[in-house]
Design a protein with these regions (language model features):
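Short conserved AdoMet
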Residues: 24, 75, 110-111
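Rossmann-like NAD(P)(H) cofactor-binding subdomain of soluble oxidoreductases
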Residues: 88-135
């Protein structure tokens, strides 16, 4: 297990959850989501979305991956991967509120020297113009 990086995956949906399981093969991973029901299922070894192959969740948990809905639990991380959906409105404009909210959460636990990676479908400039100032 590589102990140089402790990875926090923010958002355990169809992108973040498989990503967390994959990184858990080599790194310490803490998954964070605001959906407490989802957290309980994952920590119990249940993938109700069928996003990962059979055995992948069990392997990730066995390697020490933990998931939480408590923001303070991700403070020990030094790499944060924000995998939040970006829905669009009726006019196909991106709704950035979930991304802004996730950025605010990460900003509360971010330390000097930490890394933040955004894995969301957004238009060019959003990370620099919207997310970075929030962090």
């Amino acid at each position: 297990m590589n102990e140089k990086f402790k990875i926090g995956v923010i958002g355990l949906g169809y992108v973040g959850f498989p990503l967390a399981c994959l990184f858990a093969k080599k790194y310490q991973v803490i998954g964070y989501d605001i959906n407490e029901k989802r957290i309980k299922e994952i920590n119990a070894g249940i993938d109700s979305t069928n996003e990962v192959k059979a055995g992948a969740l069990e392997a990730a948990l066995a390697n020490g991956m933990v998931c939480t809905s408590q923001l303070d639990d991700i403070k020990p991380c030094n790499v944060y991967i924000v995998a939040i959906p970006t829905p669009v409105d009726d006019f196909y404009n991106p709704e950035l509120l979930p991304l802004k909210s996730a950025s605010t959460s990460v900003g509360k636990v971010l330390k000097k020297g930490d890394y933040v990676i955004y894995e969301s479908t957004v238009y060019p400039g959003v990370t620099e113009e919207v997310c970075a100032p929030i962090l």
